[in-house]
Each structure stands twice: as C-alpha cells, then as structure tokens.
Amino acid sequence: MQRMNGLSDSRYGRAANSPDAPLQNGVWGQAYNSTAHFQSDGEAQGMSRSATGFITGIDGHISDNWLLGLFSGYMQSSLNSGLSSASVDSYQIGAYGSYVWNNVSLTFGGNANLHDIDSKRTIRFKEITNDNRASYKASSYQGFAELGYNIDTRLVLLEPFAGISYAYAKTNSFTENEAVTALSGSGATSSLLSNYLGIRLSNNYAISENTSVNTKVALGWQHNSYTQPETMLNFGNNPGFMVAGLPLSRDVLYAQAGLDFNLTQRTSLGLQYRGQVAHGMQDHAIKVNLAVNF
C-alpha cells in the first residue's frame, strides 16, 4: 500500500518535486491538505488517501541567470483500503534551482524522503477476529527537469513547458504481530519515469500603490511508464506468493489555479488549488504559501 502511495505522490514533475512558492530571493513556507481516491481495478481493492503537511525553504540568486534553493518538510498521511489501513509520517529534504536565458527557463529539483509506516489489517474469518499490525520504514527519491518558454502577450504571460521526472521507492521488510494470521513481506523497490507537458498562464493586477495580486493557471498532461506495484508475501514459513496492488494510471490530466497577493514589497501570501484526474483516480489539494523576500 505504501509503495503505491509513495510513487503516486512523486508524479507530476515540478508540482511534486519542488515547492510551488515563487522562485525568488527569500524565505517561504507552505501548508497543504490533499485527498485522493483510487478505484478498484476488479482485482485489487480501491484505496483512499488523505494528507496534511508543510514545507519551508530558502532560495536566492547566485548570478543574474542562476537561482538555487533548499527546502525541508513533513507530511502525515492516512491510507484506507477496505479492512486494511496505514498511517505514514514522512520527512523530506530537497533542493531546486532555475536558469533563465532571455525567454527560455530551465527548472530542476529533487528530494529525498523517509517514511515511518504503521499498518493495520483486520482479519474476520469464522471465529477469528484479529487486528494484525506492523511498523516499518520506506524511503523514496525524486527528481525532475523542465524546460519552459515565456511569451508575453501583454494581456497574459504564457509559458508552454515540457519536462521529465523520475521517482524511486524502497520499502523495508515487515512482519505482522499476530502469530496465527501474520503476514510477512520482503523488502521491495520500484521506480517511475514520467514525461509531461502543458501550459501556464499568469497575470498581475494592481489593487493599490503597494498591493497587487498575481493570478496563475496551469493545464497539463503526463504519461507514466510505471504500471502496477507487486509485493512478495508469505504466512510464516510457507511458500511466498506475489500480490499486485492498484495500477498507476498511464496518462494523467492535471490543473492548477492560484492567487498570490503581494501584501508589501517584500511579503506575499498565496492560495493554490491542484487537481489531477485519470481513469479510476482523482486527487485534489489546497495549498497556502507565505513568502518574504530579502
């Protein structure tokens, strides 16, 4: 369950692998909440997920063209699939940057994540009713590179973009606590390579002499190479068997919309929505940003 969740969270290139706060000289913070639902494929049971977390970071220009930044974060998520559930505490560190030359921009970033997982599987069979529990760790690593081109139409700023992202996840082995019905799982690894493209639109509106609002909209499509996670399980010393999880969607449509309020020359407050839709899957998130320029 967690390996599938880790890879699904690592999709969507720049949206997931770097902060959504504007690239600038300053410090910033971001709080977010998201919910997602994955429908059953007829074999594996459907799953729902909710997550809440925050990210903080700092960035700055090292030259006229280059900007580099660092960030860290924490996320708490819950996963539910029928009689199985898990709670996950995730810790994240990462770096990002950009290079701008005339109208062309190259944006890149990556992060490393450590996940502490507590899972529960309820067993109901004849006279047996058990809550099998396990605690184990997982890790994931993600990176992306994106190329964009800014087009100023005077009415709106357009940025067509295309990029590539890669994610790798590793889950440690585990053994549930109930001896009679306990499952054991071997450690497993999986990876996801994705290509994506889309367009961003933005415009700035003056509210007063010192206050303005920047509107942002993005639409995109992503193609994923990874399909279905698999895990080797066994009961006690019995022979192991392979269990397949929910397949990740090959093609995903996503949209973002946001407002950034420039409260002063150095401080901005932003609100953003992000949605992703694919066959049998939908994911929605709300984010709040606070940034202070140097």
Regions found by a protein language model. Name each.
Residues 27-28, 160-164, 215-220:
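Extended hydrophobic secondary-structure segments that form protein cores and membrane-embedded regions
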Residues 147, 158, 163-169:
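Solvent-exposed flexible segments
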Residues 1, 42-50, 82-84, 116-137, ...:
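Solvent-exposed, glycine/polar-rich loop segments of beta-barrel outer-membrane systems
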Residues 1-157, 274, 278-280, 285, ...:
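Outer membrane beta-barrel translocator domains of Type V secretion systems
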Residues 181-294:
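Outer membrane beta-barrel transmembrane domains
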